[in-house]
Each structure stands twice: as C-alpha cells, then as structure tokens.
Regions:
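Non-catalytic cap/lid and distal C-terminal segments of serine-dependent acyl enzymes
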Residues: 1-272
Length: 272
C-alpha cells in the first residue's frame, strides 16, 4: 500500500487543506500482502470526529492493514469541527466534501472509481453524522454509509450533551455551524437529520445501504436509538438499514473493531 499526505488548495474552502490517502498496491511485504483492482479502485471516504484531523484514523487504527487485501482506496479529509456542513460562520465544508474533493481526487488518481456502487462513506462520532449528512444528500454518489457512535447531529444533542461536561464548547461550535447555539431548535429544518432520513427515502428510489454501530455504554447511546427508530419506522426498509451494538464507550477500541466489521460487509476480494 502507498500512504500519501496531500496538501492542496481548495477553491471551495478558499484555503489550503490536507488529506490522507491509502492507495492499493499489489505487493508482498513482511506480514502484509497488498491487492490492486485491475481496472479501478473502490473508495472509502473515511471521516474524523470533532476533536480530530485527517491523520487520526491512520494513527489510532490499522486502517491501512485492513484495506490492503481488499484493494480498497481510503481517502481521509480534514474539516475542523464543522460537522461536514456549510457553516453559517465558516467554510463550506459540505460543498468541499461532496463536490470539490471528489473532483480533485478524480484528477489526481485516475484509477479511483466514480461509480456509486464503489464509493462508501464512513465516520466516527461527528464523522458518523457527517457520513449520514453527505451520503443521504447524495444518494446517487454513495453505495453505502457507515455510522460509528453517531452523536453530533441536530436536533438530538439534548439527549447527551449535558452529560459530557462541555456544554459551553458545543454551544459555541453550534453558533459557528448553524448560526444558533441551540441545535435542538433546528427540528423540522434542513439541518434535522431525522427529517433528512425520511425525506431522502421519499424522494429517491436508489438509496445507500446503511450500517450503524453503537457502544452500549456510550453517552450518545440515546441518540443512536432515535436514529435507529427513524430508519426502522420507514416501511420496507428501503435503506437496508443494519444496526449493531456491543460493549463500548466513545473510544477507539470500539471504532477500530467496528470499522473492520463494516469492511467485511463490502465483500471485496481485491485483484489478482
């Protein structure tokens, strides 16, 4: 596998930014065999949480080792604490993730597949909410969405935030992102994640498959239950929604385990 750190200028963000890229490579190293798809690489867009940056998945998990035998390309962007939304008082991170970055990467990496069925978007915590936000707003671009320990989504913060001991910090972040410190007041608006789940199912016939995993001791567990209920109340399960839970709090032990389980569902076998 090739590991790349890419610095470039984003027109949408109007500033320089960074991504980490794991590139498939047919190779045999000590303790690791790599695989490369013959024609094009399937892509995992892997999103970080609120306190992290583009390097976090590479530093806290063995994502390169997990992707190697699958011939899977992994792209890890950086979006500060934006929740992957076009911020009211900040950069347009949604436009960057959903449009600008894929176009840039397609030019830089010609073997990167642009097929919907070959593009997966996943993340932890804020990144799980971001995967849902970006994926559900673009069901024609992503075949699968993976949410791990999703918590930072409107209008569900009241279910856990007061237990976190960081209420002031989240209020300030919300002002930058939404233009209001009270994200619960956004129920029924364009930012309402439950409304987005329902509206996307009504408006589109082709939908991404949803993989959702949550730790049973995670303080954000009640948020996961509301999201789960919303998906399961849609007749016919058009998202093919799949929910899993297991022991764990809001930590990397859980995310490292469950990103592997998600990759197993992709049934990728790599190239020859």
């Amino acid at each position: 596998m090739a590991l790349l750190h890419v610095n470039f200028h984003s027109k949408v963000l109007n500033m320089d930014t960074k991504i980490g890229v794991i590139m498939p490579q047919k190779m045999q190293g000590i303790g690791l065999a790599g695989s490369e798809q013959a024609d094009s690489f399937p892509v995992l867009w892997l999103l970080h949480g609120r306190s992290d940056d583009y390097t976090i998945w590479m530093r806290r998990t063995s994502i390169e080792r997990y992707a190697a035998p699958l011939g899977l390309m992994v792209i890890m962007p950086e979006v500060s604490y934006s929740r992957y939304i076009n911020m009211k008082h900040g950069p347009r991170y949604y436009d960057y993730i959903s449009k600008d970055l894929p176009e840039f990467c397609a030019k830089l990496f010609p073997k990167m597949s642009r097929k919907r069925e070959d593009n997966y978007i996943a993340g932890l915590s804020m990144g799980g909410g971001g995967a849902m936000w970006v994926g559900l707003n673009n069901p024609d671009k992503y075949g699968r969405i993976c949410m791990l320990s999703t918590g930072g989504v409107a209008p569900l913060e009241h279910l856990w935030r007061n237990k976190s001991g960081s209420d002031y910090m989240f209020k300030k972040c919300n002002e930058d992102i939404y233009g209001t410190s009270d994200s619960d007041s956004l129920a029924g608006t364009e930012y309402d994640i439950l409304k987005l789940i329902q509206d996307t199912a009504k408006e589109h016939t082709v939908l991404p498959k949803i993989y959702h995993a949550m730790g049973t001791e995670d303080v954000r567990y009640p948020v996961a239950m509301e999201i789960k209920k919303t998906f399961e109340n849609i007749p016919g399960n058009p998202y093919e929604y799949e929910y899993h839970e297991g022991p764990g709090v809001h930590e990397w032990v859980f995310w490292d385990e469950w990103i592997q389980h998600f990759l197993d569902t992709l049934a990728l076998k790599g190239g020859n």
